[in-house]
Amino acid sequence: MQFTMLRYGFEDRPPRPIIQVVAKKILVVEDTKSIREIVAFMLRSKGYETVESGDGQDAEAKVRADPPDLIVLDAMLPRKTGFDVCQSLKGDEKFKKIPILMLTAITRDTGKSDEYWKEKSQADDFMSKPFKATELVERIERLLAK
């Protein structure tokens, strides 16, 4: 048995094809920098590519320029609210299928349920702050699997 290192590496057979895994891209939109960075870090540690934005207008521009696979979106944002961004994207044929998970403290402040705000915003899911990291990841994975 002869080993051909230049042609096949360390084996006497052709190499297996390389499988290229492309990470899902998630846009994290949150005006509180520390929360935005924590969520983005957590998602990167799970293998996702992240893009960050601190306001609604910038977030919508990023989606229109390079659509992500999913958006984690705060409701209360400067320049354009998360509700407005969500409704604008869901009303656009090109972007309406991008899953949006709204992550906000608004339910705590108003006393209304997550389901109420999910329906009002047109988001695919709605999660209240404070949140558990494991639950956030589970919901993101569920939305991406659809």
Q: What does each of the following model-derived ranges do?
A:
Residues 37-45:
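Charged docking surfaces used in two-component/phosphorelay signaling
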